[in-house]
Amino acid sequence: MSEMAEPQVVKKIVLKNFRRFRDATVEFGPGLNIMVGDNEAGKSTVLEAINLALTSRWQGKFFSGELTPHFITLEATREYLEAIQAGGRPEPPELVVELYLAESANTVKLKGSNNSLGEDACGLRIVARFDKESFGEEYKSFVEKKEEVRAVPTEFYRVDWHDFGAHAVNPRAIKVTSSLIDASRIRLQSGADYYLQRIITESLEPKKRAQLSRAFRSLQESFADDESIKALNSALDASQEQITDKKFTMAINASQSNQWDSALAPHLDALPLHMAGSGEQNKLKILLALARRVEDAHLILVEEPENHLSFSSLNQLIERISGKCEERQVVITTHSSYVINKLGLDKLTLLSLDPPMR
């Protein structure tokens, strides 16, 4: 790492009635952050919630269209249903995601005290709540049939996205960006193709590209002169009367979609990428995604990079991620306690069924 102060974008996130978190605050330090926890501890939820607060999107889609009862924590849902069955008319539970940001030129316009902690801070807030004005009558009819109430009626909710100054957020005005990298959702070939094309574009002058095109064309022409191709075309020509009156032959596709750069395939130690081991493929997916996105993001979020990796490979990968993102804040989730032995405890956040500890 450089001697410069480590970058920080996100200071903490507050989650209320969101997925498995009834009321939780997760804090982050500058530079590299590692969230360690077992499966179902909520690591993925925290990363998705950070991205949600910055974009108002859940897995790429607007949250207002993705909201379902399953986003409301089970404890809040159970209390709500018990109150309904007891004959009450409680308002449905409110869902809150608050992202507290470090103050900078990019975030100062998001400053205010419109947050659950009452802090004068920079940040963004997603709130999903019952829309009484629009659905008051419908909700009244809904709770009257208490025997039919089995879930929180999120169809009667509205989703608001505000900054801590209580202003509605214009997505184009958000100057802080994140990149969420989950190897399980990335196609290895598309990442490799993008990386290759970028290297080709940046490295080859027009003359060199023309020479490669000519060399590839020569290979195509020599293939057409092969005796096996000639034999195939002779057989086709002999049977052409069955399908056409014209001479029927096969030749290499010479269209723009079959040029030399599209015929290249990346290899590792002479082995095609898709033949590499699962751990190596996951590592490549993450590093290729970083190469593509790191320049455009202030915050890098990486989901469980350790799949199919040995402990030593995981440590090497984390070091490479950190090295590639020296000027970015990074949050990595993992269920591997091995990293505790390799990193300072100040880099770790432990997630469990209890409140998270840093």
Identify the meaning behind each predicted range.
Residues 8, 21, 90-96, 119-123, ...:
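A general secondary-structure signal for short beta-strands and their flanking turns/coil
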Residues 1-55, 260-358:
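Switch/communication elements of ASCE P-loop NTPase nucleotide-binding domains
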Residues 94-96, 102-230, 234:
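Electropositive, glycine-dotted interaction segments
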Residues 49-118:
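Conserved P-loop NTP-binding catalytic core
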Residues 87-92, 116-119, 152, 290-295, ...:
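Conserved catalytic network of the ASCE P-loop NTPase/AAA+ motor domain
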Residues 51-59, 131, 164, 201, ...:
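Non-catalytic alpha-helical coupling and interface elements of nucleotide-dependent molecular machines
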Residues 2, 200-281, 288-299, 323:
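Extended helical coiled-coil dimerization/tether regions that scaffold
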Residues 16, 29, 100-104, 129-131, ...:
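Solvent-exposed residues in well-ordered beta-strands and their adjoining turns
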